[in-house]
Amino acid sequence: MTNKFILKRCTVDAWDRNCLETSLTSLKGVLTDTALDPEILRKLLEFQAEDGSFLLTDSWNMPADARVDYGYVPTYLGAAILMRAYLAPEPQLPREQIADALVRALRLSCKRRLAGHGYEAEEGTLFALRVFKLGGLRDFLEKDPAICPEFQAVVWSLIDEREAQLKSEGTIQGAWQEDYTDAWHELLEEIRPGRRRYLAYGSNMCAEQMRYRCPQAAKIGVTYLKDWSLRLYGVATIEPNPGDKTPAVIWEISRDDEKSLDRFEGYPECYTKQNFIVTVQGTRFSVMAYVMTERNKQRLRNTTPSEHYLEAIRRGYEENGLGEGRPTKRSIPSQP
């Protein structure tokens, strides 16, 4: 494969489509090849641009569609190759070297949220996720949550958004009403990890309640969600509030645990899922939190939380040594 691996950067002013397509074919071949050649990995690292991309031209100054096809697509492919190399039990190059290049490529990859161009945005997202699936995306999300949490938050958001759409509408269509429902069902099954990290800010901070709702959950630690406030509309939610912070407990939960939480939270009608990046003991990673929908807020606007519910939250604060931000009547929004 080494002799057939060709990566060249064309000039925007002297467009050579054959050269561009040859480079794309080389990247696709490496990603699907049985074994990763260390010499190819070295060439790939040498080719990586300063911005972390694997841009196939000498500039991003080109039409939007071309930026996707010859800027982002090769970066997805290059990043997926590096992901596969990083996850290998015995990496061909120093793991730290691979990780550094991988993080830079992933940061560039998530700038468009993995969307395709124009009317093909949905097809482009499916393509990008399929590329990363070949790189080991499922294992990467589950086993290495601290590697480029920005990218992981984007992928989890896409998973959550499409699962919510399938659950509420039963179908996913493109700009021209192309039906992507089956494609998403299949892909989500292939890339969704068995475990994820969940941020609890209300009664689910309480260990006793979590043992009942999520018997496979494991506590990761405690943190503060910056620029968000705890609010109570009969039950808890969080709302953006610059300068404030909300105490939270981070749990690692199984897929069955998450399905249980979905039922308790009334997802996706009463709560949506939102992904945040938090820091626990100096490590940054992506987490999911349930955030109340505006429709549910209106429905509950005249509802006050029960003392039993407040006590469950307070118990969670006490168990986790979180003295600040204990829920009080000030957490209840004023009524219009």
Where are these regions (language model features)?
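Glycine-aromatic micro-motifs
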Residues: 192-336
